[in-house]
């Protein structure tokens, strides 16, 4: 058993760098993040964003080097939970950088000893407010009158190093790095810039996104919202998205801003057939109208809509295609684009986390569809701006 590596940095630092467990160099020097991955983190990724080590408090969820340097070999996981929570909660914090999936899981599940881990590649870059943390983590951070602490998950620098050649000198020679290595590093640098903006107060929490659907609105309210969309200026872009189950459309969503969406379920049992037909006609008129349309991999949606007689006119921008032109080295799925071009935290787990007895066409399914529309609209507008620069 090795000696514990204690936290390092100002006890009242506004930024916490929460790692997983120390490596060989950290154990030898009894200081966090001094090995190759720590140097990559502090000397390059955070330094380029203007974040200096002396302004952060660095610590781990497990303070001892694992046997064989593998997390799976730790027999006393959870041993340092109380010490970690006490350290984090000793002073108000602006940002906790959760470095790697074990650090993220600690914040969200409340212990280093967790049954399942959250996938860091999915959650990285998300602005997670403290009300989403585990109850014991929230309690540790509870300061009367202080602003909520934000956590930003980041891919572990060791993953950057493993996925491609690592240029420790920082001279920019990435000729030997594979595609994953390049985009992992780009994502870490993007997230570091976001963290700096949070600390400086330049960005705040994500906007509230309102999704109208059959679970929270009456039929007449949805009908009126669609009519208002039809009456809007035809120059305002409209994002659209569908959800399918077994090759059948379950709902159709539209949004004319990043904060408001309307979802028409095709499976709502409380509506009469004539009401269902009217709303489908309404949304068909919206999609066939003159407004520019935004979609994500929209060929899929357009083909499914065509099968039920809904045309999509004036297609303006496919967010996946636009992003592939601008940044071919980075994946182009909507979760990735959401993390890069909006402040919306990762929400794709809504498809996986629905209640067992909730049908595929329930309220969570509809809200998920509406969020897709809102973020697609926001991503599309930001990509359009970027392409024009």
Model-derived regions, located:
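DnaQ-like (DEDDh/DEDDy) 3′-5′ exonuclease domain used for proofreading
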Residues: 11-13, 188-238, 246
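Short acidic, glycine-rich loop/turn motifs
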Residues: 132, 142-144, 254-258, 357
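Short, basic/hydrophobic alpha-helical segments
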Residues: 81-92, 225-229, 274-290
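Short hydrophobic beta-strand that contains or immediately precedes a catalytic carboxylate
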Residues: 16-18, 238-241, 295, 316-317
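A polyanion-binding, active-site-adjacent surface
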Residues: 1-199
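Short glycine-rich phosphate-binding loop at a beta-alpha junction
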Residues: 94-99, 239, 291-299
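Short conserved beta-strand segments at catalytic cores or DNA/RNA-binding microdomains
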Residues: 20, 49, 241, 251-259
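Active-site-proximal helix-loop-helix substrate-binding element of RNase H-like nuclease domains
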Residues: 148-152, 157-161, 167-170, 174, ...
């Amino acid at each position: 058993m090795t000696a514990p590596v204690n936290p390092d940095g100002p006890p009242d630092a506004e930024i916490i760098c929460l790692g997983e467990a120390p490596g060989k160099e950290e154990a030898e020097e009894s200081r966090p993040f001094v090995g190759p991955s720590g140097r990559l983190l502090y000397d390059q990724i955070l330094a380029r964003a203007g974040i200096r080590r002396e302004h952060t408090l660095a610590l781990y969820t497990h303070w001892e080097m694992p046997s064989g340097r593998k997390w799976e070999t730790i027999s006393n996981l959870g041993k340092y939970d109380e010490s970690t929570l006490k350290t984090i909660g000793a002073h108000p914090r602006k940002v906790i950088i959760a470095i790697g999936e074990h650090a993220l899981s600690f914040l969200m599940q409340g212990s280093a000893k967790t049954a399942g881990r959250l996938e860091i590649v999915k959650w990285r870059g998300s602005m997670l407010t403290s009300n989403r943390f585990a109850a014991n983590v929230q309690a540790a951070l509870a300061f009367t009158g202080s602003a909520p602490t934000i956590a930003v998950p980041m891919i572990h620098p060791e993953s950057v190093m493993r996925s491609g050649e690592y240029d420790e000198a920082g001279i920019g020679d990435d000729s030997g790095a594979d595609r994953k290595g390049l985009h992992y590093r780009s994502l870490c640098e993007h997230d570091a810039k976001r963290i700096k903006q949070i600390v400086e107060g330049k960005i705040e929490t994500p906007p509230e996104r309102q999704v109208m659907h059959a679970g929270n609105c009456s039929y007449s309210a949805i009908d009126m919202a669609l009519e208002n969309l039809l009456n809007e200026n035809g120059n305002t872009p409209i994002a659209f998205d569908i959800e399918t189950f077994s090759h059948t459309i379950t709902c159709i969503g539209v949004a004319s801003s990043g904060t408001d969406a309307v979802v028409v379920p095709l499976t709502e049992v409380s509506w009469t057939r004539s009401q269902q037909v009217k709303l489908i006609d309404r949304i068909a008129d919206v999609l066939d109208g003159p407004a520019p349309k935004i979609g994500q991999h929209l060929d899929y949606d357009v083909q499914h809509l065509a099968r039920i007689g809904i045309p999509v006119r004036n297609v303006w921008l496919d967010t996946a295609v636009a992003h592939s032109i601008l940044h071919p080295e980075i994946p182009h799925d909507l979760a990735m684009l959401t993390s890069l071009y909006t402040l919306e935290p990762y929400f794709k787990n809504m498809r996986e986390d629905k209640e067992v007895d909730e049908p595929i066409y329930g309220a969570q399914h509809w809200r998920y569809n509406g969020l897709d529309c809102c973020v697609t609209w926001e991503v599309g507008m930001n990509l359009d701006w970027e392409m024009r620069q």
